[in-house]
Structure formats: C-alpha cells, structure tokens
Amino acid sequence: MTRQSLWDLSETDVEDGEIRINVGGFKRRLRSHTLLRFPETRLGRLLLCHSREAILELCDDYDDVQREFYFDRNPELFPYVLHFYHTGKLHVMAELCVFSFSQEIEYWGINEFFIDSCCSYSYHGRKVEPEQEKWDEQSDQESTTSSFDEILAFYNDASKFDGQPLGNFRRQLWLALDNPGYSVLSRVFSVLSILVVLGSIITMCLNSLPDFQIPDSQGNPGEDPRFEIVEHFGIAWFTFELVARFAVAPDFLKFFKNALNLIDLMSIVPFYITLVVNLVVESSPTLANLGRVAQVLRLMRIFRILKLARHSTGLRSLGATLKYSYKEVGLLLLYLSVGISIFSVVAYTIEKEENEGLATIPACWWWATVSMTTVGYGDVVPGTTAGKLTASACILAGILVVVLPITLIFNKFSHFYRRQKQLESAMRSCDFGDGMKEVPSVNLRDYYAHKVKSLMASLTNMSRSSPSELSLDDSLH
C-alpha cells in the first residue's frame, strides 16, 4: 500500500474504512475509527503511518493487496485486546502468567491503567506475590547458608578437643554449658542458671522496698543481710559459670568475642568493682565520693536479665532481628522525627500563649513524642480546640507511622526465629561419639560439613511442607 492510500484510509474514510488484523492465525476485520479511539496504542499508531517502513516497524508483516497486518503474537490474548478497543476496558486473561500478560499489553501499547476494576486488584496482587515469594526464598536460602556456617563452626570447635588432654571430657562439659537442651545435664544446668538469674533480679527489686531495708548506724537505708546472702550466692554462681565456660572453651581467644560471654562478664564485673570501691572508701574517707560510683554500678545488676538470652530462642531471635533490621528501625525513627518536628511546631504556635506546658518547642517535642507513640502520660495537654484537633491528628499519624515499619520487622523476626529453631534442632542432632574416629582417610571437617548440609536441607524442606504433605510422607515411610 502506498503512503497516500493508507493516509486516505485513516483520514478521509474513517467511518467505513476497514483493515484486516492477523494475530498468529486469528483474523479479524476492524473499523479504523474503532482503533483511532486510542491513537497511542500500537494499532492506533499503525493507521497514522506514512510509509511502508513505518508500518513494518509496528507489525511483523503487511499484505498490500489484502491490506492485512500480521502480528506474530499470542492469538488467545488478542480477543481481550479487541474487547478493550470496543469498550475501553481491559480484562485480564486468568490462564496467562501475569508477567506474560503484562508484556503482551505493553506490546500492544495498552496501559495497565485501563484494566477494569473487577480484575485490577487480583492482577496487581499476582504481580506482587512473586516478589514476596522471591524475598522469602532468598531469605530461606540465606538462613540455610548462615545456619550451615554456624553449625560448621560449631563442629570445627568441637573437633579442636581431639588430641588435647581430657579432650572428650572437656568437650562434653563444653556442650553441656554452651548448648541448653543438648543433654539432660545441660537442661539441668540451664534450669539452675535461669533460677539464679531470676532470683537475683527479684532480690534486687525487693531490696528497693522500704519494708525490706535496714537502717545503718547513720540512719541511711541499707540492704537486708538475707538479700546480701542471695546476692553473693548469685555472684558466686555467675563467676563459676563464666570460669567453667572459659576453662572448657575450645578457643580462648574467640571466647570473649561471643556476645553471650560478654554479657556473662558484664553481669559480675560491677559487683567486683563495687567491692573494690567500698574497700577504698573505708580505708580512705577522703575518697567518699567514689561511693556514688558504687551506687551507679549496683544499678547495672538489672542487665543480668540479658543472661536469659542464652536459654531463650526468642531473645536471641530478637537480638538478630534488631541487628539486621537497622534500616527498618532507622526508617521508624525517621518517620517519628519528622512527625514530632511538625506537630511540635504546630502545637507551639497554637498553645504558646494559652498553655505554659507548651510554651517552648522543646517542651512540645516531649508532648509530640508521647502522643505519636500513643503513650499519652497526660502531664501536658492542649487546652484550645485547635490544639486538641492537632493532638488528634498527631495520635492518628503516630499509629500509621509505627505500624508501617513494624510489619517488616515482624517478618524478619519470624524468619530469624524459624532459623534459630532449625539451628537448635541441628545441634541437638549432633553426634560426637567414637564412631567418627573409626572412619579412616576421611577429613573430619568435611564429613561434618556434608552431614550438616544434608541435615539443614531436610529441616528447610520440612519447614516448607504443609501438614498434609508431612502426614503423607509419614504414611509412606
């Protein structure tokens, strides 16, 4: 077809002109005015071409005699395209992959904006699901790899006892002390450690009550001797626990690089520093101000509660979540900072002349902080109508700001909790019997690595299987 005849078809014979469309063998006659309703689409631009070269840039082939345009595309989807030209609404082909459908409509020059409301929600939901599944799969893969590395390091540490004096005995003690749930001995030791930690915390809390305080010779409140006995027993237990772990550690240099061991150290150091300070103050009254240091150090006993992280999967998962969620936590703090800055200035502008509690912007920062976090102490409240409306908006904004990043943090917590449970299950399945030493010409580390990799793969598959699949597997075996 010449340039003039095609242009005449689209300009002078718009009402009656027809063109033939062949999409993978699916043929249809279409009126030109139907296609020109959407001139930005591929078929609409086809009618506005001025040369054969321009036509062939938009279609795969063109028959001058039949005036037929050929497209080597999916013929099953083209009826949906035709329906769009007739009604202006695009429906989604459910049988086709959502990304293939997206590529097809992009080829035809149809924007996703034209997808009808009945299909829009499911279409965009199906596009998001693969991204979420990809993130979950990547997280599971990273979890398995990280867990495998940790267990491999665990096996490597255990193998260091081979050839050492009392190596097998020290290894069993190390497993019992460092891995709660590994054996009956480790469970008993774990329960005793938890009871001592809780007893120490409860004693510290009860000691703050006036009914349990005994005045000294100067009338100052002092500790009950019974509580001091409990405190000294707790310190003795914590010291024994730390020294025992250090004595049976496979690598003394790496011992204090472990965060849990640092927590154990910090739980007893304040007591010994306080003991030294008290001795110095008693021997030299001029250094009485050092007694304040001892009082501050005594408050650090509350951090002993962190020792429970060694015995709690949830606490360790929480620590890992906070470690790897710094972006989400930073995002949460950023949202709160922006909201606090905005609402504090608004409250200051409205309430500065009516309310002494909101007479300065720093004072308004405090009010905006407790309002956005929905704490609401009630110590400072706006008095004007405009101030109350501002407070309502501040509270609603705080709810939205806190909820958005919390979902991401919760997903990561679930991920790390599942990983930690798999890690503990794998460690409880470890076997350090003499059977390993009976295998000659096999590298112990490689054997451990192969065994752990198989174990982690099976645990990951089990976590992905549904209950029905698990029951079916059990019935087959």
Curated annotation (Swiss-Prot):
SMART domains: BTB. It is found in: Cell membrane. Detected in brain, lung and in pulmonary arteries. GO terms for cellular component: membrane; perinuclear region of cytoplasm; plasma membrane; voltage-gated potassium channel complex. Pfam families: BTB_2 (PF02214), Ion_trans (PF00520). Residues 207-225, 281-290, 349-361, 382-388 are extracellular. Keywords: Cell membrane, Ion channel, Ion transport, Membrane, Potassium, Potassium channel, Potassium transport, Transmembrane, Transmembrane helix, Transport, Voltage-gated channel. It is a multi-pass membrane protein. One of its GO terms (molecular function) is voltage-gated potassium channel activity. Heterotetramer with KCNB1 and KCNB2. Does not form homomultimers. The transmembrane segment S4 functions as a voltage-sensor and is characterized by a series of positively charged amino acids at every third position. Channel opening and closing is effected by a conformation change that affects the position and orientation of the voltage-sensor paddle formed by S3 and S4 within the membrane. A transmembrane electric field that is positive inside would push the positively charged S4 segment outwards, thereby opening the pore, while a field that is negative inside would pull the S4 segment inwards and close the pore. Potassium channel regulatory subunit that modulate the delayed rectifier voltage-gated potassium channel activity of KCNB1 and KCNB2 by altering their kinetics, expression levels, and shifting the half-inactivation potential to more polarized values. While it does not form functional channels on its own, it can form functional heterotetrameric channels with KCNB1 and KCNB2. Each regulatory subunit has unique regulatory properties that can lead to extensive inhibition, significant changes in kinetics, and/or substantial shifts in the voltage dependencies of the inactivation process. This is Delayed-rectifier potassium channel regulatory subunit KCNS2. The gene is Kcns2.
